[in-house]
């Protein structure tokens, strides 16, 4: 709704223009500081009541050296890779032999579809990848 007169025009003569006492509109003194100021001083009780876990440390950060991160490839992507570079792979008993570690991958995951019978060698396989490789007439070899 459009107002004909601005707020300041309405407030003329009221001295505080809607801010209560004259001192209340100056800086942040009326609020006890801006934002989180005073949370360990004069606002401590409200912190204890409404946000008791705000201060202090919780949990731990795991040592990055202990985390095992494997380079992964999905079985569908692996088949695309084989079809793209056919000449680079050996064929034994009608199955393409693929060593995933030679192309920079350690774990084979099960996303995607495959129709090529292949012998896949890798450090690890997901359950889905194992099922799909065997369903296509291939086999997997864990290194």
Curated annotation (Swiss-Prot):
GO terms for cellular component: cytosolic large ribosomal subunit. Residues 1-13, 23-38 have a biased composition (Basic residues). Pfam families: Ribosomal_L27A. Residues 1-38 are annotated as: Disordered. InterPro entries: Rbsml_uL15_N, Ribosomal_uL15, Ribosomal_uL15/eL18, Ribosomal_uL15/eL18_sf, Ribosomal_uL15_CS. PROSITE patterns: RIBOSOMAL_L15 (PS00475). Gene3D superfamilies: 3.100.10.10, 4.10.990.10. One of its GO terms (biological process) is translation. Keywords: Ribonucleoprotein, Ribosomal protein, RNA-binding, rRNA-binding. Coiled coil: none annotated. GO terms for molecular function: rRNA binding; structural constituent of ribosome. Part of the 50S ribosomal subunit. Belongs to the universal ribosomal protein uL15 family. HAMAP family: Ribosomal_uL15. Binds to the 23S rRNA. This is Large ribosomal subunit protein uL15. It comes from Methanococcus maripaludis (strain C7 / ATCC BAA-1331). The gene is rpl15.
């Amino acid at each position: 709704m459009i107002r004909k007169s601005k707020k300041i025009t309405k407030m003329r003569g009221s001295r505080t223009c809607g801010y209560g006492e004259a001192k209340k509109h100056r800086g942040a003194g009326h609020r006890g500081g801006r934002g989180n100021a005073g949370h360990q001083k004069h606002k401590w009780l409200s912190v204890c009541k409404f946000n008791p876990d705000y201060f202090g440390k919780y949990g731990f950060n795991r040592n990055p050296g202990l985390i095992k991160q494997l380079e992964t490839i999905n079985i569908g992507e692996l088949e695309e890779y084989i079809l793209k570079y056919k000449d680079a792979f050996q064929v034994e008993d009608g199955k393409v032999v693929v060593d995933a570690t030679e192309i920079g991958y350690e774990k084979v995951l099960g996303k995607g579809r495959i129709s090529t019978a292949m012998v896949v060698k890798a450090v690890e396989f997901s359950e889905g990848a194992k099922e799909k490789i065997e369903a296509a007439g291939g086999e997997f070899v864990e290194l």
